[in-house]
Amino acid sequence: MNNMSLSDIFERFDTSKDGKISWEEFRDAIHALSPSIPSEKLVEMFIQLDTNGDGQVDAAKFASCMDQTAQSSGGDVEKELKDAFKLYDINCDGKISANELHVVMTRLGEKCTVESCVGMVQAIDVDGDGYIRFVGV
């Protein structure tokens, strides 16, 4: 994914740049990386990771969560990410727009606005062109 490490991904979603991600940042990160995870599972994961109850998850806890996600998906995170990318890339042009993200998330039953999807895209848009790309898809 543009050669991004877990720490790069964490930093992209740490919009407040305080070294921790809030529930909203966590939810957006996991949904962007693994859209098939149900909301109830996300809440459960966040509660388990937020061991001190401060409503924040640090980079180490986030990495642990991603490792657990990889193990539960059979260990092939890259394949899962590629499959998720293809799901969101509605017009198959190799990039995901905020509108495509909104359409798919709405179909998956998520209540979100186009504006919130613009924010999610901006959070992980590597080159600032308004799209998410997955190199090698």
From Swiss-Prot:
* Gene Ontology terms, MF aspect: calcium ion binding
Q: Which Pfam families match?
A: EF-hand_1, EF-hand_5, EF-hand_7
Task: Name the source's superkingdom.
Answer: Eukaryota
The record, for InterPro entries, names: EF-hand-dom_pair, EF_Hand_1_Ca_BS, EF_hand_dom, EF_hand_pair_protein_CML-like
UniProt keyword list: Calcium, Metal-binding, Repeat
Q: Which residues bind Ca(2+) 1?
A: 14, 16, 18, 20, 25
Using the record's annotation, list all stretches that form the EF-hand domain: 1-36, 37-72, 76-111, 112-137
Question: Any keyword Metal-binding?
Answer: yes
Protein residues bound to Ca(2+) 2: 89, 91, 93, 95, 100
Q: Which SMART domains match?
A: EFh
The role this protein plays is: Potential calcium sensor.
What this protein is called in its record is Probable calcium-binding protein CML33
Q: Which organism is it from?
A: Arabidopsis thaliana (Mouse-ear cress)
Question: Coding gene?
Answer: CML33
